[in-house]
Amino acid sequence: MIMMQFACPLLKRAFFLSALSLLAGTTLVHAQADSLDDHKLTEVYTPVPPVVTPAAKFGEAPSDAVILFNGRNLDEWVKVSDGSPADWIVSKDILTVNKTSGNIQTKRSFTNYQLHLEYRIPANITGSDQARGNSGLFLASTGKGDDGYELQILDNYNNPTYTNGQVGSIYKQSIPLANPCRKPGEWQTYDVAWVAPVFNTDGSLASPAKVTVFLNGVLVQNSYELKGQTRYRGKPYYKAHGPSPIKLQAHGDKSEPISFRNIWVRPS
């Protein structure tokens, strides 16, 4: 073996320091690799999600849901106009719009939630365009009348209209991704995930509302960011508000009134 000869002790010392540094670096790399390979470093145990008992049948309310319409009464609802008890028609587990009474909304207010609702356009529906089975699900009611954010309800089974006003649209804002409308006389379902807008202390918008909507099990709105509250004329805009009721619309068209059942919400 050939031994390396050093010209001076200083060079010899520098060589050994360099070798020691290289050894330390190699050890550190191996230590880091070992840490990355430790699966426990990426495991999280808290918080623990709450246990929710799912419904026996799809569409029925899970154990933590707030039942908004139980098929028997309107204890969870009031008139939008004056806050008096809602007087839409309840019969045989079905809620039917009373067009002479006006819109109704929940007594409770909500922020973010999951909502399930079923509706039916009458089999004998008449009219056309927007005057055929028109109603609306307001995801947050922010005042009287039609103030708020409207998810359109309309008969669009062989009934053309403007596309940002058909069923599944965020009215006058977002065209639905598909038209899975069933025939009049058949029950239809809305499943909604709503994220309310957030406002700064000065009333300015911090983050917009977002909504994901399934109509009859088909995705029609995919995490859509709303531009503001619904407006029939003009551009939508935001106005600061807090937790809000959910509203159902009694539309003024002359077609036969629509019906609802199985309405529940899971606040999140």
Please name every model-derived segment:
Residues 14-26:
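Bacterial N-terminal signal peptides
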